[in-house]
């Protein structure tokens, strides 16, 4: 039986990476066999692409950015995700295709159709079964990142992150059957409890 595929999404600073780690710990205690990955990265090739994408010294044009993310994603799908799912493992990914929709398609202005075409090739049409979207305001994200060294995308201005959030909220509205919206403005453990509740409800329903 094919394993379940869960992705986490949100603007930079929303706390999704922390929530991925907490969910991983919880599900392992519950006995689930799972593989946790990140984007861009997760493979040797992907991690090299990640270095290029996040380096603030690099001037990267929107189309280049889209293709670099897609190349990392293609490697991750072929090398890690599809083999794990075929073995029945649960796969949790910190960012996936929706990041490209909102960052390159919406915030960079490339358009969703262009991003969709490229990424359908990269992922072989693979989509997460559910996507946990951690929602916070750009103001809160900026506050949380104060004092921390920002990468190339984190260092974008307020308007960019505002567009990213708008893009995510549009996806949540357009694909309610896949997206789970979590209020990320609360403290870490409160958010974790909401994530666990939502994921466990999905997993129980998927077993029926």
Curated annotation (Swiss-Prot):
GO molecular function, one term: dTMP kinase activity
Domain of life assignment: Bacteria
The enzyme's E.C. designation: 2.7.4.9
CDD domains in alphabetical order: TMPK
Cellular component GO terms held in the UniProt record: cytosol
One record GO biological process: dTDP biosynthetic process
SUPFAM superfamilies: P-loop containing nucleoside triphosphate hydrolases
Residues passing through the membrane, by range: none
Recorded family membership: Belongs to the thymidylate kinase family.
NCBIfam families (alphabetical): DTMP_kinase
Record protein name field: Thymidylate kinase
Natural source organism: Caldanaerobacter subterraneus subsp. tengcongensis (strain DSM 15242 / JCM 11007 / NBRC 100824 / MB4)
